[in-house]
């Protein structure tokens, strides 16, 4: 995962997509618990991916990537 994160930080969209695929089930579970409605869940996951992609260079510790994305997801859920 570490090398994918570095590639994604360098702008590799395929690496970023692979990272998201690796954690998609966890993102879905967290969002589903908070929102219940599948349409809202998918909207929030999409917004999370956009936000994470735009902010990826701000991630200071690559080992916390999944935690960082889940925190973004929770913040997005709170907007609903």
Task: Label each PLM-derived region with a short phrase.
Residues 27, 31, 56, 69, ...:
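Hydrophobic-face residues of short alpha-helical interaction/recognition segments
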Residues 34, 38, 55, 62-63, ...:
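Short coil/turn segments at alpha/beta junctions that flank glycine-rich nucleotide-binding fingerprints
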């Amino acid at each position: 995962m570490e090398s994918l994160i570095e590639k994604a930080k360098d702008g590799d969209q395929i690496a970023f997509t692979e990272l998201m695929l690796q954690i998609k089930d966890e993102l879905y579970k967290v969002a589903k618990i908070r929102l219940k409605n599948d349409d809202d869940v998918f909207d929030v996951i999409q917004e999370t991916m956009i936000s994470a992609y735009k902010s990826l260079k701000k991630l200071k510790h690559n080992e916390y990537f999944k935690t960082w994305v889940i925190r973004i997801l929770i913040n997005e859920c709170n907007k609903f």
